[in-house]
Amino acid sequence: MPSETLWEIAKAEVEKRGINGSEGDGAEIAEKFVFFIGSKNGGKTTIILRCLDRDEPPKPTLALEYTYGRRAKGHNTPKDIAHFWELGGGTSLLDLISIPITGDTLRTFSLVLVLDLSKPNDLWPTMENLLQATKSHVDKVIMKLGKTNAKAVSEMRQKIWNNMPKDHPDHELIDPFPVPLVIIGSKYDVFQDFESEKRKVICKTLRFVAHYYGASLMFTSKSEALLLKIRGVINQLAFGIDKSKSICVDQNKPLFITAGLDSFGQIGSPPVPENDIGKLHAHSPMELWKKVYEKLFPPKSINTLKDIKDPARDPQYAENEVDEMRIQKDLELEQYKRSSSKSWKQIELDS
């Protein structure tokens, strides 16, 4: 009997996986995508490195960074692949959000929003700008995908609702984010020293936003115990590891609320005197919470939220030969501009 060729062996292996994957509930796609966005210097890189067991100091993310991790679910099984994308610069690089989110990645895509709890005045605008920009692009991709694969879009929407029990009292009141969303409040070690009333407003506001979007919410710091809990959540997104069902809603402790386990009844109304609520003139619950939050933590000018520093001049990325050539080209450009300006003036005089 002739020996099998490499292609025949590969074909048989693929068919074998297909048969095994069709048993039970079906095998999950072994490739997932996790996109980290959030506050500038909020700790996104640290969380990613911790999840991948990489013992290296985090470096500032210049624009859009990519890395990946691999993990086997069992002995002698193919390793699942998780693609990690990270957007740097806070809200200054919103245009780059579209790069990791495509029709090919969307079906196994998750979003992680990391918010710096130590800077409460920046928290709402950072959260709002990033979530709006991401949702807008995801909606466009879903609409385009729906024209060619309506079944995939339907399955995605159903999957989003799976986190919310059908008998949940808020089932008709929430508007789940179009992809799985986890909101992480970082630098809890600084946040825990805030005044009680400030912590209360921040905690209740983030609980409302997370529950409204069908998202998980948790706080973290440099504490090894908290980082391990966050690692477990990210591993669930990246590798399908069992989801934690633990919950902590005590504002005097780090919040940890898995999607679907909170409720508007438990969160309560916005922390503002009842006679003041009518004066806020909000058109939706989300707008009401925003007005209440920004009354205590007024946002800084939008210009201050953007990173105006030129990355090309960052000493961390210095390269002598390239930098010298850049200086030379900048000088040549200035000379060209002056020369062109003189030429046009001469033409105007001659005419």
Curated annotation (Swiss-Prot):
The alphabetized UniProt keywords are:
Cell projection, Ciliopathy, Cilium, Cilium biogenesis/degradation, Cytoplasm, Cytoskeleton, Developmental protein, Disease variant, Dynein, Golgi apparatus, Microtubule, Motor protein
- Which segments cross the bilayer? none
Record's subcellular location: Golgi apparatus; Cytoplasm; Cell projection, Cilium; Cytoplasm, Cytoskeleton, Cilium basal body
Q: Name one GO biological process term.
A: regulation of cilium assembly
Protein family according to the UniProt entry? Belongs to the dynein light intermediate chain family.
Q: Does the keyword Cytoplasm apply?
A: yes
This chain belongs to the protein called Cytoplasmic dynein 2 light intermediate chain 1
Linked pathology: Short-rib thoracic dysplasia 15 with polydactyly: A form of short-rib thoracic dysplasia, a group of autosomal recessive ciliopathies that are characterized by a constricted thoracic cage, short ribs, shortened tubular bones, and a 'trident' appearance of the acetabular roof. Polydactyly is variably present. Non-skeletal involvement can include cleft lip/palate as well as anomalies of major organs such as the brain, eye, heart, kidneys, liver, pancreas, intestines, and genitalia.
Q: How does it assemble?
A: Light intermediate chain of the cytoplasmic dynein complex 2, a multisubunit complex composed at least of eleven different proteins. The cytoplasmic dynein 2 complex consists of two catalytic heavy chains (HCs) and a number of non-catalytic subunits presented by intermediate chains (ICs), light intermediate chains (LICs) and light chains (LCs).
Which tissues express it?
Expressed in bone, brain, kidney, and cartilage. Lower expression in heart, liver, lung, placenta and thymus.
Q: Which InterPro entries match?
A: DYNC2LI1, Dynein_light_int_chain, P-loop_NTPase
Query: Which cysteines share a disulfide bond?
Result: none
Instruction: Name the PANTHER family on file.
Output: CYTOPLASMIC DYNEIN 2 LIGHT INTERMEDIATE CHAIN 1, DYNEIN 2 LIGHT INTERMEDIATE CHAIN, ISOFORM 2
Spell out the Pfam families in the cross-references. DLIC (PF05783)
- What GO annotations for molecular function exist for this entry? dynein heavy chain binding
Whose protein is this, by species? Answer: Homo sapiens
Summarize the protein's role: Acts as one of several non-catalytic accessory components of the cytoplasmic dynein 2 complex (dynein-2 complex), a motor protein complex that drives the movement of cargos along microtubules within cilia and flagella in concert with the intraflagellar transport (IFT) system, facilitating the assembly of these organelles. Involved in the regulation of ciliary length.
- Name a GO CC annotation attached to this entry: motile cilium
